[in-house]
A protein has these predicted regions:
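Short SAM/SAH-binding signature in class I
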Residues: 145-147, 160-168
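Rossmann-like AdoMet
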Residues: 2-65, 83-116
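S-adenosyl-L-methionine
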Residues: 108-157
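A short glycine-rich, Lys/Arg-flanked "PGG" loop and its adjoining helix->strand segment in the class I
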Residues: 177-192
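Core SAM-dependent methyltransferase catalytic element
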Residues: 212-235
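Glycine-rich SAM-binding Motif I of class I
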Residues: 75-79
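Conserved S-adenosyl-L-methionine
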Residues: 71-73, 98
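Conserved beta-strand signature within the Rossmann-like core of class I S-adenosyl-L-methionine
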Residues: 193-200
Length: 235
């Protein structure tokens, strides 16, 4: 039943009106007015990505590392992770899952390379979005990217990933994406001692994580959000 609910909600998402907005740190994101929901925090898309996924996720690991992103979206998290790979000379195998890819014209409205002062890597951001879906692309010697076009409930990986960026739409608009069914799949996908990070901090989300076996800790959230979760697959 949960899987049918996810598909139904995602079909609705495909039809929802979308607009590009500028967040408080100057970086852009996509907003769904009917849901009052954004792809990233309105308080700062780049600030949120760096705080949640880099500072509290990627920084825990040395190379090589395998990452699963739940909600590839605009590609911001992948791009920032690529920049970190270059900075640290860290080899990263990155998999981004997205049921409904962002349109090409929307991608043109994303100003991440400029806001990150990384215009020399703007071609990398473009390369990520031009790469074929469901095929592994060697973005550079350090960074490979596989964009998988699938629903989250269709994920059936087993102990492949070191780190998961859980960046689905919020519980308020898509609670089915934060269920025990989905988190069981996340737990199964992680290697022993793997880590999942997310911007979320609702009690119901924490309970779902704990129910499937995660050890969960609450951390200080990004600007505009008091708290966030980091979960470990401890063995």
């Amino acid at each position: 039943m949960a899987s049918k609910s996810i598909k139904s909600h995602c079909k609705i998402l495909k039809k929802v009106k979308r607009e590009i907005i500028k967040t408080l740190d100057g970086s852009t994101t996509i907003r769904l007015p009917e849901w009052d929901e954004c792809y990233h925090s309105k308080h700062g898309a780049i600030q949120e990505a760096k705080h949640v996924f880099i500072k509290n996720g990627l920084s825990l690991f040395e190379n090589p590392i395998s990452i699963l992103e739940i909600g590839f979206g605009t590609g911001l998290n992948a791009f920032i992770t690529y920049l970190e790979a270059v900075r640290k000379n860290q080899k990263i195998d990155y998999v981004g899952v997205e049921a409904y890819p962002v349109d090409a014209d929307e991608i043109l409205g994303m100003n991440y390379a400029a806001e990150l002062e990384a215009l020399e890597f703007e071609n990398i951001f473009e390369k990520m979005h031009k790469s074929e879906w469901n095929e592994k692309a060697e973005i550079s010697d350090l960074f490979s990217l596989t964009k998988r076009k699938q629903f989250f409930h269709e994920i059936n990986d087993f102990e492949i990933f070191d780190l998961i960026y859980f960046d689905a739409f919020g519980y308020r608009v898509q609670p089915e994406l934060w269920s025990t069914e989905i988190f069981q799949k996340m737990y199964n996908s992680l290697k022993p001692n793997g880590v999942l990070v997310t911007y979320a901090a609702r009690g119901v989300v924490k309970r779902s994580m704990i129910e499937v076996g995660f050890t969960v800790e609450k951390l200080t959230g990004p600007p505009g959000k008091r708290e966030m979760f980091r979960a470990f697959k401890k063995v």
